[in-house]
Amino acid sequence: MRSGRRLFPLLLLALLPLALLPGLCHGREPAPGAVTCGSVLKLLNTRHSVRLHSHEVKYGSGSGQQSVTGVEASDDANSYWRIRGKSDSSCQRGTPVKCGQAIRLTHVNTGKNLHTHHFPSPLSNNQEVSAFGDDGEGDDLDFWIVQCSGTYWEREDAVRFKHVGTEVFLSITGEQYGHPIRGQREVHGMPAANHHNYWKAMEGVFIKPSLDPAKHDEL
């Protein structure tokens, strides 16, 4: 009997590291703060405190495509983006987005994808970032790699988005537009990783993370 009492604390110590493994006691699911496929959110540039934004205003130069800007207002409905994979099958609704995964960001109100290409941006002469496509379908220049430090993209983390096709980072350096979008900031691509290209998930509708896409709900 005494032998059994001595073994019980040892057994607890042996099991403790297993209990601390993320998701082990929850069907191996990631932490509830993981950003998931299908979620709709706003993205804040942490350096300049503006949210990624688009609208039915086209660039007057460069590609002439729909412009992408940064806005200070937190309640602007044109700042919502849907998280999607390179294909819908590669990023099923409720699946947590992994660090290093390629995604698409689809503008909710216009159905166009975050996009960049070899046109100069109008204010800083960096690489133009636009919104492109119809009903969520564009081309191979709509893909962005989520750069973060853990296993999954967590909502509280500052992350970078690196463009697959041209290897620039989604950035803001503070240049402001005049009429008709006065005060909005230029969004562009920069070749170097720096403090201008950190983004954080903010307001939105987040699908509860699950490694089983059949099991999900909204937070």
Regions inferred by a protein language model and the residue ranges of each:
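Lectin-like carbohydrate-binding module/patch detector with strong preference for beta-trefoil
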Residues: 2-219
